[in-house]
Amino acid sequence: MTPTNVKTRFAPSPTGRMHLGNLRTALFNALLARSRGGRFLLRLEDTDESRSSGAHAQTLMADLRWMGLHWDEGPEAGGEAGPYHQSERGAVYERYYRALEAADQAYPCFCTERELELSRKAQRAAGKPPRYAGTCAHLTAEERERRRAEGRRPTLRFRVPAEETVVFHDLVRGEQRFPTDEIGDFIIRRADGTAAFFFCNAVDDALMGVSHVLRGEDHLTNTPRQLLLLRALDLPQPEYGHINLITGDDGAPLSKRNGSLSVAELREAGWLPEAVLNYLARLGHHYTGEVESQLLDLQGLADAFRTDALGRAPARFDRHQLSHWQQLAVHRADEATLAPWLERLDDAVPADRRRALLAAVRDNILFPDDLAAWGQRVFGPLPALAPDTEAVIRDAGPAFYEAALAELETTAGDFPALAKAVRKATGAKGRQLFMPLRAALTGLCRGPELGPVYALMPVDIARCRLEQARELAATTP
């Protein structure tokens, strides 16, 4: 296969917000396509009418665009293999259903859910894995008509060939073997006439020219069923790779309870898409060499992407690692990227000083809320001081702050000049000079370089804080 023939896809169901697991699946497929000069397709699997909605579909596509994952083919992008909403492909599926029935490779099943559950219970009681018992596999035409006359609405089941073994090479897990006798005939059309996942997912991949499918390992047992379907329909079979699942700190599958976030929540909190992409690209995929620690754009991530570097062990979500990439992304971000953060600042921060504030504290913030907190520290009343900050102020003593107040007017906005004057007046130097000034002016013992921060601080606010520090230093704990 030449690189230009590679086509991957992301095929979500638009039934709710997109979370990290689905986002990583989309990313890996996009990276695989771009790493080989191929195409990335988006298909919306919206056959579940009770849960799918147009609003969810629009949100999902907006999330992908925000992350920079633009599809080459699919909804709104067009393409020759559409439509790309499964809800619009009923006639396509019906054609292949008829072909399977004509070849006696599919049959109507009239079993009720209660009958199926009783059968499964009996199989478990006998120590056998539950699978369809074949109750309707060989009904005569008369028996089928009688059941229809009783008002039973049949599903359509695929007839799985007996005594075979489905063998395929998984791009992540190597050779996989599944005896067909352990599969059982499975539903390909629901009783309401809608297409079941096994069927429409496989047929659409084939008809849309998808060559490679990366999806979660929870789909591994679906693959032999889909390969059997494609073989029966004489349709091309893609190469499959089943990636590891993401788990939380507790080792359980990632969920809202143990740390999962939706893309919408990430965006609202101020996570930058570059940070999320760089973290997820390394969550279950190992980059080597210089690129391992570099913040890369999408093409850079794709250039170093390899399916043989995809891991099999569960990928544990690590928020600290995600924060590391956020720090790199914030440091590298241009003014336009962080402009929305400025708009979220409190009115107390003068509009003409917002960019300077961002520049002063950029290396010490990760999110818009962090910037807002620094806006408060520079232009508003300080929050309550931590015990270690109070201790620094008391250790400096009231005379230290009296000296600072005496020099305030002549050194307004010029921290080096203020520090020099206080040093001359008190003899303090090093940590004994800078730490008490930082503690009094910002309410913290550590933070960004104090010069740019002090240059932004109004003189009356600086005076008030030095006076408060003088009063605190004169008290005993």
Swiss-Prot record:
UniProt-annotated binding residues for Zn(2+): C109, C111, C136, H138
Xref: SUPFAM superfamilies: An anticodon-binding domain of class I aminoacyl-tRNA synthetases, Nucleotidylyl transferase
Places the protein is found: Cytoplasm
Leading EC class: ligase
EC number(s) from the headed UniProt entry: 6.1.1.17
PROSITE patterns assigned to the protein according to its UniProt record, in alphabetical order: AA_TRNA_LIGASE_I
Residues where ATP binds: K256
Keyword field: Aminoacyl-tRNA synthetase, ATP-binding, Cytoplasm, Ligase, Metal-binding, Nucleotide-binding, Protein biosynthesis, Zinc
Motif ('KMSKS' region): 253-257
Catalysed transformations (reactions): tRNA(Glu) + L-glutamate + ATP = L-glutamyl-tRNA(Glu) + AMP + diphosphate
A Pfam family reported for this protein in Swiss-Prot or TrEMBL: Anticodon_2
S-S pairs: none
Gene Ontology MF: a single term: ATP binding
Cellular component per GO, a single term: cytosol
Motif ('HIGH' region): 12-22
Cofactor(s), by name: Zn(2+)
Manner of cofactor binding, per the entry note: Binds 1 zinc ion per subunit.
PANTHER family to which the protein is assigned, alphabetical: GLUTAMATE--TRNA LIGASE, GLUTAMATE--TRNA LIGASE, MITOCHONDRIAL-RELATED
Family the UniProt entry places it in: Belongs to the class-I aminoacyl-tRNA synthetase family. Glutamate--tRNA ligase type 1 subfamily.
Subunit structure: Monomer.
The protein's role, per its UniProt record: Catalyzes the attachment of glutamate to tRNA(Glu) in a two-step reaction: glutamate is first activated by ATP to form Glu-AMP and then transferred to the acceptor end of tRNA(Glu).
Designated name of the protein: Glutamate--tRNA ligase 2
Organism field: Alkalilimnicola ehrlichii (strain ATCC BAA-1101 / DSM 17681 / MLHE-1)
